[in-house]
Amino acid sequence: MVSLKDSHFELFHLPAQFALDEPTLDAAYRAVQSQVHPDRFAAAGDAQKRVAMQWATRANEAYQTLRDPLKRATYLLHLRGVDVGAENNTAMEPAFLMQQMEWRERIEDAAAAKNVGELDALLDELRDERRARLAKLGSLLDSGSDQGAAEAVRQLMFVERVSAEIGAQIERLEH
C-alpha cells in the first residue's frame, strides 16, 4: 500500500532514476487518478472527500515533478540528500560563465537591433544546449555523480531562464 509520504516514484510504482519512459509515467498517473479522483467520492462523507482531494493533489504534484526533466533531477537529488542550492550556490565552471556572458551580449545586441531572427537563432541554440545538458545530467545521475549533477541542474536552470528571457524579448519585438 502506498502512503502519502512515499516518494513520487513509489506513488507511480516507477524506479527512482532519471531516465523515465513518459508513456509509462502517463499511464501510471492516469491509473492513480482514476482511483483517487474526487468525482469518485461525490457521494462519500466529508472525511473521505478530503482524503481523496489530498491524494489527487499529491498525484498531480508528483506527476508534474516527474514529467519535467529538470524538476525530476532536482527531486532525485533531494531523495539522495543533495541540495541543488540554486538560491545560494552560484559557483559555475569558468567556461559556462563565459558562455553566459556571450549569450547575454547576443541577446542585448539582437534586442537593440530589433533582430527577431537572431533571437530565434539563439533560442534554437539554447534548445540544443538544453538537450545536450539534459543528456549529460542523466549520465551524471546514473553514475552517482550527485555533486556534478547538482551543478548541471543549476546550469540548466540558467539555460531555461535565458530561454524564457529570449522568448519574452521576441514577444515584445513582435507586438
UniProtKB/Swiss-Prot annotation:
Belongs to the HscB family. Disulfide bonds: none annotated. It comes from Burkholderia thailandensis (strain ATCC 700388 / DSM 13276 / CCUG 48851 / CIP 106301 / E264). SUPFAM superfamilies: Chaperone J-domain, HSC20 (HSCB), C-terminal oligomerisation domain. This is Co-chaperone protein HscB homolog. Signal peptide: none annotated. Keywords: Chaperone. GO terms for molecular function: ATPase activator activity; protein-folding chaperone binding. Co-chaperone involved in the maturation of iron-sulfur cluster-containing proteins. Seems to help targeting proteins to be folded toward HscA. It comes from the Bacteria. One of its GO terms (biological process) is protein complex oligomerization. HAMAP family: HscB. Residues 7-79 form the J domain. Interacts with HscA and stimulates its ATPase activity. GO terms for cellular component: iron-sulfur cluster transfer complex.
